[in-house]
Amino acid sequence: MADATASFDESGLRAVTATPRAAGDSLATAGVWEANAESLAAYATFCRTALFAPAQSPQWVRHWTEQVRPDTVVATLAVGGRPVLALALEIERHGPFRVARFMGGRHANGNFAAADPVWLETAAGPATRPLFDAIAAARPDIDVVALQRLLPDLDGRANPLAALPSHNSPNLSLAVDLEGGFEAVLSRTSGKRKRKKHRSQTRKFESAGGFRRLDAGTPEEVHSLLYAFFAMKEFRFRRMGIANVFGDPQVRIFFHKLFAEALKEDGAPFRLHGLEVGGKLRAVTGSSVSDRRLVCEFGAISEDDLAHASPGDFLFFENIRETCERGFSVYDFSVGDEPYKRQWCDIEIRHLDALVPLTLKGRMLASCLRGNAGIKSFIKNSPAIWSLTKTLRRKTAGKRLPAEED
């Protein structure tokens, strides 16, 4: 077997490679490594000139590997001896199956694997096949590679993984076109009503002891906002009757590390904002930067005496205004179709789920996952059924449902 990915890492790591295949006029080969210090350093080096989504950034991948410590691999595709695509994956056991997925699980949304921008101009779905052959050869225990919530494109370049056999993700993603600045955004989204509500909220918050919007600029501020956010989410998930996807202590440490370490980098690729009223945090958002797109990765409000004043809406108003002032072109609310997002959004993004079975068991699992996604899509696209589902879920709040049911 030829080591076609030596240029990916010059430290001499051994890679398991797939049988070379023709890709245009060049030879495409692939390699797979355990995600260790050397391969993660090589991944970071490749990302310096690559295009990728926030959840595939070197920072996200490194902190997830170090803090959550899953079973992980880094797979690379090279064309003509030059790396063009890198997949950082974690492997999880689901019953009798092993599934490889993007690091971060359900926290990884709007996914776009690290890829060479020049290669993306001509890349096609079949060109990625050697990558999955290599994964199957290196890790025959993996049944399915589940690449979920894929962005169809990023910065005008098509996602090569979206060309794989895929289906629509059950959850829609919503975003705001910021063209023309904040005034233009308001003019397109009931701006008069929004301004009136914002003024009313301002008066309520001032009478409740004053308010301030926080932009976490120190590790201490990061930790303070995250502690508050996790408490808000814990309360809400318990009330809704679903498992808390932020409940794992290692996942919480991951986010603390991710946002605190991001402060050391130019432009802070991950940022926290909060709204404090009367000396108490009432709303928190966590965002990532993807070129000229700001992505709200998560948010929560304190369900207390001021919840009726919609502190979350107030914070989004200020966040979107600042995002416009900073010259971004899109404010992305990420996954989930909710009324508070619809008040702003004029862009719908349909993510894709690509399932690549590597074993006979994997084919069976992929078929079940596709069927499950179809059922979820039907439920969530049927307002009456979805409303009934959420009502039943709240009534069974003492019996935790899987987080995937959200």
Task: Give the location of each predicted region.
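Active-site/acyl-donor-binding loops of N-acyltransferases
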Residues: 2-27, 152-184, 189, 293, ...
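Low-complexity, flexible helical/coil segments
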Residues: 110-115, 120-125, 180-186, 209-213, ...
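Intrinsic-disorder-associated interaction segments
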Residues: 36, 54, 121-124, 191-194, ...
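A broadly tuned preference for mixed-charge, low-complexity surface segments
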Residues: 86-90, 124-145, 192-210, 229, ...
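A conserved beta-strand-loop-helix scaffold within acyl/acetyltransferase catalytic domains
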Residues: 25-102, 149-173, 181, 186-308, ...
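Acyl-donor binding region in acyl/amide transferases
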Residues: 72, 92-169, 290-349
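Intrinsically disordered, low-complexity, positively biased terminal segments
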Residues: 2-4, 114-158, 162, 216-217, ...
